Curated annotation (Swiss-Prot):
PTM annotation, UniProt: Phosphorylated upon ligand binding; which is required for desensitization.
Glycan attachment points: 8, 20
Classification via Pfam families: 7tm_1
CDD domains per the UniProt record, alphabetical: 7tmA_CXCR1_2 (cd15178)
Official protein name in the record: C-X-C chemokine receptor type 2
Organism: Oryctolagus cuniculus
């Protein structure tokens, strides 16, 4: 598809639904000359965003690489949950590779053309959807293992790998609209942007493509997690399963951090949707408030990609031991120092899979 030019794009098509869509998590273009409300969200913050993106990129690159290394190094004792967490680390690492590009675009505008616009936008979408879908899979796995305390077909590792592959496939399908409609756009008197081009049906399709992915890629998996963890926690507390409860701390922390990072963005996006459909009256003040909120919550969502390894380092005893074991094997720390670290015993559930490498 050729790069988009402003001459073929009508005012109504663009500003008629001048939205912060994109379940893709990135902010809309700032078109000061074509909007009746002067945007106040990005101009003064571009360098703050740039620095934040670069820091998240470096932390995510290091942290998720270490997580993958530890899990793969311990693959002989790798549990079902570890397979899911490995895929989470892969998703976050892939997303981190796009952050330098997004950081540069915040300062200089989108100067990378349409092909790269499509690719990096697709990676962002797939990262988000795969993250919440894999967390939903973990919640179902823990629900079956603890609440029903039975070994199920889902515990077989080759089937778990198939489930992970399926989640990647679903994430890709949910992200296809971004691949199809994203283009480099060159508005007059403004920096180029990476944004949706849907022709004469921009307003209609943008709302459809906002609601459907939000329903199937966020709300439904969130309800699954809520159901599973409510009953899982109830079972743990009723049975006084202290050891299993401690083994679940890492998983609960991962889910909680995901929600803390992404729920604010989705709530702001919901508010923006209500404003676009005139359920909430739109004013210049409210529009700028929404733009600023999306700016801030997007950064919070991006921050998530580097937080899981930090959780593992502070809460996951087995992750710390596994990392020290790798360092000792390569002579980077003494074996005497490793011996001082008592390896925590693996906690076995009825399904044999409550323990994780992390």
């Amino acid at each position: 598809m050729q790069e988009f030019t402003w001459e073929n794009y009508s005012y109504e098509d663009f500003f008629g639904d001048f939205s912060n869509y994109s379940y893709s998590t990135d902010l809309p273009p700032t078109l000061l000359d074509s909007a009746p409300c002067r945007s106040e969200s990005l101009e003064t913050n571009s360098y703050v965003v740039l620095i934040t993106y670069i820091l998240v990129f470096l932390l995510s690159l290091l942290g998720n690489s270490l997580v993958m290394l530890v899990i793969l190094y311990s693959r002989s004792t790798c549990s079902v949950t570890d397979v899911y967490l490995l895929n989470l680390a892969i998703a976050d690492l892939l997303f981190a590779t796009t952050l330098p590009i997004w950081a540069a675009s915040k300062v200089h505008g989108w100067t990378f053309g349409t092909p790269l616009c499509k690719v990096v936008s697709l990676v962002k979408e797939v990262n988000f959807y795969s993250g919440i879908l894999l967390l939903a899979c973990i919640s179902v796995d823990r629900y079956l293992a603890i609440v029903h305390a039975t070994r199920t077909m889902i515990q077989k590792r080759h089937l778990v790998k198939f489930i992970c592959l399926s989640m990647w496939g679903v994430s890709l399908i949910l992200s296809l609209p971004i691949l199809l409609f994203r283009n480099a756009i060159f508005p007059p008197n403004s920096s180029p942007v990476c944004y949706e081009d849907m022709g004469n049906s921009t307003a209609k399709w943008r709302m459809v493509l906002r609601i459907l992915p939000q329903t199937f890629g966020f709300i439904l998996p969130l309800l699954v997690m809520l159901f599973c963890y409510v009953f899982t926690l109830r079972t743990l507390f009723q049975a006084h399963m202290g050891q299993k409860h401690r083994a679940m701390r890492v998983i609960f922390a991962v889910v909680l951090i995901f929600l803390l990072c992404w729920l604010p963005y989705n709530l702001v996006l919901l508010t923006d949707t209500l404003m676009r459909t005139h359920v909430i009256q739109e004013t210049c003040e409210r529009r700028n408030d929404i733009d600023r909120a999306l700016d801030a919550t997007e950064i919070l969502g991006f921050l998530h990609s580097c937080l899981n390894p930090i959780i593992y380092a502070f809460i996951g005893q087995k992750f710390r031991y596994g990392l020290l074991k790798i360092l000792a094997a390569h002579g980077l720390i003494s074996k005497e120092f490793l011996a001082k670290e008592s390896r925590p015993s693996f906690v076995a559930s009825s399904s044999g899979n409550t323990s994780t490498t992390l």
